Amino acid sequence: DAVTVASHVRKDLDTLTAGEIESLRSAFLDIQQDHTYENIASFHGKPGLCQHEGHKVACCVHGMPTFPSWHRLYVEQVEEALLDHGSSVAVPYFDWISPIQKLPDLISKATYYNSREQRFDPNPFFSGKVAGEDAVTTRDPQPELFNNNYFYEQALYALEQDNFCDFEIQFEVLHNALHSWLGGHAKYSFSSLDYTAFDPVFFLHHANTDRLWAIWQELQRYRGLPYNEADCAINLMRKPLQPFQDKKLNPRNITNIYSRPADTFDYRNHFHYEYDTLELNHQTVPQLENLLKRRQEYGRVFAGFLIHNNGLSADVTVYVCVPSGPKGKNDCNHKAGVFSVLGGELEMPFTFDRLYKLQITDTIKQLGLKVNNAASYQLKVEIKAVPGTLLDPHILPDPSIIFEPGTKER
């Protein structure tokens, strides 16, 4: 499709120059001090600007196919504010697909050297004030966040999907893990749906989440499949998203005009931005598609979960149980995978319309089991809430075991 105007480029946070960082930080400090950022952050969680059955709820959309669209609008909202306040750069993205060695200085340092004033000042990206409460956001990075291929592996399976709704559920649940593992256990943290948007890292995270969607769109274009529209949930795609549709809450013209999910796909022409690259870990779209096809050649097994809201954030860990010792005894000490659920007191009720699939193939093979024989093992689920408390594993339906035969085995 012809691009009419893509007037700004979203860059990798790690590639910004010192001057670009200074400009971005100055603009962000402005929108913190005049409460613009707090007001935008209020769109997502607390205080609950939307209504559901007569109750205040968070406006953010989770657990449904319009999740990518809502958050594309949100990042665009922040980007417009930053550009209006003099930022020389668009919203950068925090690329967490590659294994994270350490958090970027922009978000991890409590202070920065203000070269204009020749002094150390508080870093506005380190935390954010929570609207309506005497609190600031905190982070408590967990060990799982660093030095592993989790995000890359999960991203590959999401990108493999050639149906928008199949892509969306894998994509959304993947994004939850960064919330959980960067936010940690505290109340006013990045891991709480109610408070996460007040943390400045939120829009950097969601710029990368949005870039992942843009990569999927390019893959779809390369595949000759729908990429600028959804081939599912058509009714939802026509319904404007709140509070972007509300001119009283959202005076921003562009996100108001394009508040229907169907209008968010064409981000270059409607929102006038593009990314510096749509490569994934230095792989072009054709290279990536070749890799995805190779990964589909051999059979894989998954634990399938029907996820719904529970009013809290949690990590869900899956273990494989195999017979051990006396009859009826099982050894369940074989961790097969983990995924995260993002929730909060004000979350809008949701139930995904299809199963989230967590791949457990490696563990099955390591145990010497056949991937196409689910009768030889069982699954055990452990659900741990963000504060660290164990929950009843039955708050989610028991998982299904799903075998997908390889393309070379059909």
Curated annotation (Swiss-Prot):
PANTHER family: TYROSINASE FAMILY MEMBER (PTHR11474)
PROSITE patterns, A to Z: TYROSINASE_1 (PS00497), TYROSINASE_2 (PS00498)
Name of the featured protein: Hemocyanin, beta-C chain unit D
Signal peptide: none
Chain sites annotated for binding Cu cation B: 175, 179, 206
Protein's job: Hemocyanins are copper-containing oxygen carriers occurring freely dissolved in the hemolymph of many mollusks and arthropods.
Cofactor requirement: Cu(2+)
Glycan attachment residues as annotated in the record: 253
Domain of life: Eukaryota
Binding site for Cu cation A: 44, 55, 71
Linked residues for 2'-(S-cysteinyl)-histidine (Cys-His): 60-62
Cofactor binding description: Binds 2 copper ions per heterodimer.
The keyword Repressor appears for this protein: no
Self-association and partners: Decamers of large identical subunits (450 kDa), each containing 8 globular oxygen-binding functional units.
GO MF annotation list: metal ion binding; oxidoreductase activity; oxygen carrier activity
Cysteine-cysteine disulfides: 50-59, 165-232, 321-332
Lineage, top ranks: Eukaryota, Metazoa, Spiralia, Lophotrochozoa, Mollusca
Coiled coil ranges: none
Family annotation (Pfam families): Haemocyan_bet_s, Tyrosinase
Record's keyword annotation contains Disulfide bond: yes
Family: Belongs to the tyrosinase family. Hemocyanin subfamily.
Keywords associated with the record: Copper, Disulfide bond, Glycoprotein, Metal-binding, Oxygen transport, Repeat, Thioether bond, Transport
